[in-house]
């Protein structure tokens, strides 16, 4: 009897009759828009970030919505630099509350570690919490600052009647990159933004059977290299989850990815790989 007759078959040997197949790597994601400084995350922030990591979310971009929240976002990034980056900016509902201090303060904040974009900035004519003329002034000043600092811009556009597109068109040549986050616009608006080489952020709005139908039809039209995913947590919890969690959080991003992949007719792993690469490129995260 040959000496090695009773040796067990080694599954990883080239001559093994039953080679072990490596399990596919689980999808990895980047959530480009989370309001982690919101008070609803105050009591369990570490657990929220931990659940996101366990769900395959490798990086969270914390949204800055005013100067105080931008400072808080920077502080969070200092606590969890391996998981968090942030934007600094003033979003349209509070545009009337800022004055001459805005640009010097934002310029200083943008120099902090972890800051990867200017925003959230833009226009919101749906709620009109600030006068529209003041919204446009504050948006224009932040676009100019982003151009000066050569940082990408994280844009809010809600019912702006084409004014966001018009202002982006005016400034686009000087801007390095633009994402219109939580896109909920029309096909014509999508076409105009793509013509300006903008990225498009898709949230759990696409999972909402009551109001997400038009967006669901547009998702396949977004070029693969322009697509980014976000939860916009704690809002916009995906309604496709049953039971529906009481609060959205970045650990639920894979559900948005699942729905988007289905709409685009691609594998979830393919979508995760592509949108993660897009986010790393957009926010200059290649050093992670």
Predicted feature residues:
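Mid-domain alpha/beta scaffold segments of enzyme catalytic cores
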Residues: 2-288
């Amino acid at each position: 009897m040959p000496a090695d007759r009773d040796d067990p078959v080694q599954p990883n040997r080239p001559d093994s009759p039953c080679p072990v197949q490596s399990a596919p790597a689980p999808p990895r994601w980047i959530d480009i828009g989370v309001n982690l400084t919101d008070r609803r995350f105050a009591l369990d922030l570490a657990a929220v970030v931990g659940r996101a990591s366990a769900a395959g979310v490798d990086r969270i971009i914390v949204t800055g919505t005013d100067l105080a929240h931008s400072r808080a976002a920077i502080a969070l990034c200092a606590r969890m630099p391996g998981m968090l980056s942030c934007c600094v900016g003033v979003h349209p509902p509070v545009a009337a509350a800022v004055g001459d201090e805005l640009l010097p303060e934002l310029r200083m904040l943008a120099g902090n570690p972890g800051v990867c974009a200017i925003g959230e900035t833009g226009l919101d004519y749906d709620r009109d919490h600030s006068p529209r003329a003041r919204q446009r002034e504050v948006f224009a000043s932040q676009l100019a600052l982003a151009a000066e600092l050569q940082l990408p811009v994280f844009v809010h556009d809600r019912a702006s009647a084409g004014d966001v597109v018009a202002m982006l068109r005016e400034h686009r040549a000087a801007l390095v990159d633009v994402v219109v986050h939580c896109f909920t616009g029309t096909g014509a608006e999508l076409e105009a933004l793509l013509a300006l080489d903008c990225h498009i952020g898709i949230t759990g709005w696409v999972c909402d059977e009551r109001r997400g139908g038009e967006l669901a039809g547009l998702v396949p039209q977004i070029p693969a290299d322009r697509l980014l995913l976000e939860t916009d947590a704690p809002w916009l919890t995906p309604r496709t989850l049953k039971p529906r969690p009481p609060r959205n959080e970045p650990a639920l991003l894979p559900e948005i990815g699942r729905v988007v992949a289905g709409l685009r007719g691609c594998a979830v792993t393919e979508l995760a790989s592509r949108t993660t690469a897009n986010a790393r490129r957009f926010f200059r995260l290649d050093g992670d």
